[in-house]
């Protein structure tokens, strides 16, 4: 919402809740189109659409985040009979467990990031029989390359710098991802003219200038800080 300015900055802010709860992103690869469904209010990925090995459109979704009826509206190519609620939840830990990552610390960091990697994993889930490990790995990379890249210019810049190649992720990327809500609340409730009232440490060193966080998008926390800002300041 261009009218929302948090902490005296020009960082974009997600608009207030509306009747349009979801948005759709379409990706093209050598095997065709794969679509993602995201929640507008926080950019959480709630579903994806791909063809199976019989070229039938199928939609897979997190049942706690979107209903079958909402999914039909968002991804109408898949009939209700061809919708499937995923057996795991939308949090990173659950997806990582199903991705069966055996390297290093066994988290998404070990997979890396990059456009070529995203394209490879799209091809692994499109026009093929469903394999949960491939699906979970696709979701891990797709979430980071869409929602997380929108939230953090730091991640955007890494993608651009290495485009289109795969690159190794890093601890700082993970710390950004798990602290989006906390960072948004700190900027909303405890920053003025782009400067925090105290030093903050979000897992990668102390920060006083908001610009040093290289944010791309903040979560919606209200239109006017006032009492709400006091509440968020107290939480931090």
Curated annotation (Swiss-Prot):
The keyword Transmembrane does not apply. It comes from the Eukaryota. GO terms for molecular function: rRNA N-glycosylase activity; toxin activity. GO terms for biological process: defense response; negative regulation of translation. Signal peptide: none annotated. PROSITE patterns: SHIGA_RICIN (PS00275). Its EC number is 3.2.2.22. Gene3D superfamilies: Ricin (A subunit), domain 1, Ricin (A Subunit), domain 2. Belongs to the ribosome-inactivating protein family. Type 1 RIP subfamily. Ribosome-inactivating protein of type 1, inhibits protein synthesis in animal cells. Useful as immunotoxin for pharmacological applications. This is Ribosome-inactivating protein saporin-3. The gene is SAP3.
